[in-house]
From Swiss-Prot:
InterPro entries: MFS, MFS_dom, MFS_trans_sf, Proton-linked_MCT. The gene is Slc16a11. Belongs to the major facilitator superfamily. Monocarboxylate porter (TC 2.A.1.13) family. It catalyses: pyruvate(out) + H(+)(out) = pyruvate(in) + H(+)(in). It comes from the Eukaryota. This is Monocarboxylate transporter 11. One of its GO terms (biological process) is lipid metabolic process. The keyword Secreted does not apply. GO terms for molecular function: pyruvate transmembrane transporter activity; symporter activity. It comes from Mus musculus. It is a multi-pass membrane protein. Proton-linked monocarboxylate transporter. It catalyzes the transport of pyruvate across the plasma membrane. Probably involved in hepatic lipid metabolism: overexpression results in an increase of triacylglycerol(TAG) levels, small increases in intracellular diacylglycerols and decreases in lysophosphatidylcholine, cholesterol ester and sphingomyelin lipids. It holds the Pfam family MFS_1.
Length: 447
């Protein structure tokens, strides 16, 4: 029998996995972010309110995240490769089914349930597999993969507006169904990797496969609570930034430009944040607090911008606020997944990723419909963005208790080498980076 490697290769095929995760993220969250541009067309076609149509994107987000632990459990049992490939097929079928919808219920089932279930099977296994391939450059690799969100939004926002103008919402969804089928070959690139911290046998029970025992660890529980609160406002701009720009007096392509500006800032910030986190200059929990708070302030700023005088106006204040939001939200995203190996160990990172996505789904299910409800009551999205920013700022405040919850931040040091397959805190080298020269002392990035 071939012995297991001592640790992640920190490169090699890992960069191919990073490229696959990049595409998976772009075809999931990038597409979900751009779908908000189609909501006004759906509301007009079906003669329904903004709150009713917001449930289309909200259900897709909620199902994708709520079912992420199922994707993680299936990946733990059968491997990430087949799970992601099946998820790509389900996502494509959901979009194609939605193109022939005769009512909002059909869209709820097609985009919300079927496509959302497919997205649930692709994201957590892909990102969890990527985390297993890297150690010293883990957050940078995760940040690189998560730039797929911004890069995809940059391309899909104007492309989707063009498709809506040219083919209508039915033709646009049909073509997007063909595009998302590319998730299947991306899954084929996720080569399995055996590590020394892996359990000798797959979990025997469904509860063990879901990794619910991780909530017994105080650090993970604090992190999960803060992340769930942030999810209540984090995804509202994904769904309603485009419609908010339209309400502010900008035309269709002006609204697409606002989404694209946020996407560019998001993509650039994810790489920069990943590089910064891997340097070890600032502990990861403190970075979470800083960039989480800035994200909340960015959403607040978008809710306070004045309206544009004419439809031809470009809305410089909203563009600036969207850029600031994109930079802060993009900086926050890789830290959420980069900190997980330090909280639960490399053996539990796939399960923890799924659980975090499930918790964020609680906010993802609440935020967009609440935003649509407030828009129907007030006439615009200003109040919606103000309320959702309070969720993000509250979650960032919860993160401030994270260092105290980590065993390595208490006066008594933890054991030097706890078994990672039991979901315990990894030794410091697993969550830190060597000095800039590649050698020398290792800096603790946890506290």
């Amino acid at each position: 029998m071939t012995p297991k490697p001592a640790g992640p290769p920190d490169g090699g095929w890992g960069w191919v996995v990073a490229a696959a995760a990049f595409a998976v993220n772009g075809l999931s969250y990038g597409l979900l972010r751009s779908l908000g541009l189609a909501l006004p067309d759906l509301a007009e076609h079906f003669e329904r309110s903004a709150q009713d149509t917001a449930w289309v994107s909200a259900l897709a987000l909620a199902v994708q995240q709520a079912a992420s632990p199922v994707g993680s459990a299936l990946s733990t049992r059968w491997g990430a490769r087949p799970v992601v490939m099946v998820g790509g097929v389900l996502t494509s079928l959901g979009l194609v089914f939605s193109a022939f919808a005769r009512s909002l219920l059909h869209l709820y089932l097609g985009l919300g349930l079927l496509a959302g279930s497919g997205w649930a099977l692709v994201f957590a296994p892909a990102l969890g597999t990527l985390s297993r391939y890297f150690s010293r450059r883990r957050v940078l690799a995760v940040g690189l993969a998560l730039t797929g969100n911004g890069a995809s939004s940059l391309l899909l926002a104007p492309a989707l507006q063009f498709l809506l103008d040219t083919f209508g919402w039915r033709g646009a969804l049909l073509l997007l169904g063909a595009v998302t089928l590319h998730l299947t070959p991306c899954g084929a690139l996720l080569r399995p990797l055996a590590l020394s911290g892996d359990p000798l046998a797959p979990p025997r029970t469904p509860l063990a496969a879901l990794g619910l025992g991780l909530f017994k660890r105080r650090a993970f529980s604090v992190f999960a609570l803060g992340t769930a609160l942030i999810g209540g406002g984090y995804f509202v701009p994904y769904v309603h930034l485009g419609p908010h720009a339209l309400d502010q007096g900008m035309g269709g392509y002006g609204a697409a430009l606002v989404v694209a500006v946020a996407a560019v800032g998001d993509a650039c910030a994810r790489l920069a944040s990943g590089w910064l986190a891997d340097q070890g200059w600032v502990p990861l929990p403190r970075l979470l607090v800083v960039f989480g708070s800035l994200t909340g302030l960015g959403v607040l700023a978008m809710g306070l911008v004045p309206t544009v005088g004419t439809e031809e106006g470009w809305g410089a204040p909203l563009l600036a606020a969207a850029g600031a939001y994109g930079l802060s939200a993009g900086s926050y995203a890789p830290l959420v997944f980069g900190v997980l190996p330090g909280l639960v160990g490399i053996g539990g990172v796939v399960q923890a990723t799924g659980l975090v996505m499930m918790l964020m789904s609680l906010g993802g299910l609440l935020g967009p419909p609440l935003s649509g409800f407030l828009r129907d009551k007030t006439g615009d999205f200003s109040a919606s963005f103000l309320v959702c920013s309070s969720f993000i700022l509250s979650g960032s405040f919860i993160y401030m208790g994270l260092p105290r919850a980590l065993p390595s931040c208490r006066p008594a040091s933890p054991p030097a080498t706890p078994p990672p397959e039991r979901g315990e805190l990894l030794p410091v080298p697993q969550v830190s980076l060597l000095s800039a020269g590649g050698t020398g002392s290792i800096r603790d990035t946890t506290c």
